[in-house]
Amino acid sequence: MADTPKEGKLTRFLDFTQLIDLASECVGGKVLFATDDFFGPAENLIKSNNPSFKENEYTEFGKWVDGWETRRKRIPGHDWCVIQLGIQGIIRGIDVDISYFSGNYAPRMSIQAANLSEDTVTNIPPRGVKMGAAATSEEFVAITELKSHSWDYLVPMSELKPGDPDSSHNYFFVNSQQRWTHIRLNIFPDGGVARLRVYGTGQRDWAALDSTEPVDLVAIAFGGVCVGFSNAHFGHPNNMIGVGDPKSIADGWETARRLDRPPVLEGNENGFLQVPGCEWAVFRLAHPGVITQIEIDTKYFKGNSPDSCKVDGCILTTLEEEDMIRQKWSLPAHKWKPLLPVTKLTPNQNHLLDSLTLELQDVITHARITIAPDGGVSRLRLKGFPSSICLLRPLREKPMLRFSLKAGFRANL
């Protein structure tokens, strides 16, 4: 994730940087090919950490660099690499980060993309240690089968700014609703790039879903996304719906300490703190559906987990969602249906809970987690069944419920 905004305001500019990096090594991104890796291998492009600089560090090939840097080209052509996305999905925007590359950065670049089947890339040979080397003839022959030169352009040839602190990030919006699995980064003619961030939303094949097992309907890998929040001082809510287990306290949603907390805290007869305020985050599900299981993980939040939380759901059209974003989610209380009542949370622990879905009559499209008074949550999993499956099967051996879905909702299908 990029650096997060401090308060709950969704800006229209560079919103995509709060989405998941589909190419990151953390989610399974992989470099399949690079024409040249002389000063720095292309694998550096998809590292999850920010680039660094070591002033007096050298390798046998030259200055140590934290990025992909090719040799000064002395043959016809230009350099390029192919990356397999760790999460297949819709690309919303791209950040070509040139940090610490000033006299050696790539002056121009373009990005192409394709939607390939898994068996298409089986003949690509694995990459070994590539520093100081160029692609072999065998690798060129194998990658030619992908015909990557003819892939669709997401970003045409564009000039890049040098890697100075105030100009190292080169942002590009992507206007495409297609699903992509691979990208090709072209640099013209040679040089260095520190990081390539491919921001977007995951997209899964819901038709191929196993109808017998609940699925995490809010997972960012499938298309879930945060569409509003009250505070994200130390970590964006999208972190909660990330891939895999949390890696550290930075890999979660954490708010600032509320300034309206009482000078002396008191509890009620049920063991909950009596505090005036709370924090919240709203998510659009990857697919409308019914939530049957809720997982709330406070791992790594040992001295800063919330006292309690609750989860609610609602059903909104796309236009209603856009209106709520403008209104900072001032949705009338009666529109929210309880999925989880106010529940005490324990620090550094995963909480597995049943939802109140059996009481609901409608499929939900959005979910809201509310924490009191403040603090951090590392993971939120909302497991259940997509609406198409719910219509075909009973829920928990109960009589068939009536599900309805308002017209006008655009799911990530």
Swiss-Prot record:
NCBIfam families membership: allantoicase
Cystine bridges: none
Gene expressing this chain: Allc
Summary of the function given for this chain in its UniProt record: The function of this enzyme is unclear as allantoicase activity is not known to exist in mammals.
Protein name, per record: Probable inactive allantoicase
A molecular-function term among this protein's GO annotations: allantoicase activity
An individual GO BP term: allantoin catabolic process
PANTHER family named among the record's database cross-references: ALLANTOICASE (PTHR12045), INACTIVE ALLANTOICASE-RELATED (PTHR12045:SF3)
Annotated source species: Rattus norvegicus
SUPFAM superfamilies per record: Galactose-binding domain-like
InterPro entries named in the record: Allantoicase, Allantoicase_dom, Galactose-bd-like_sf
Sequence similarity: Belongs to the allantoicase family.
HAMAP family, sorted: Allantoicase (MF_00813)
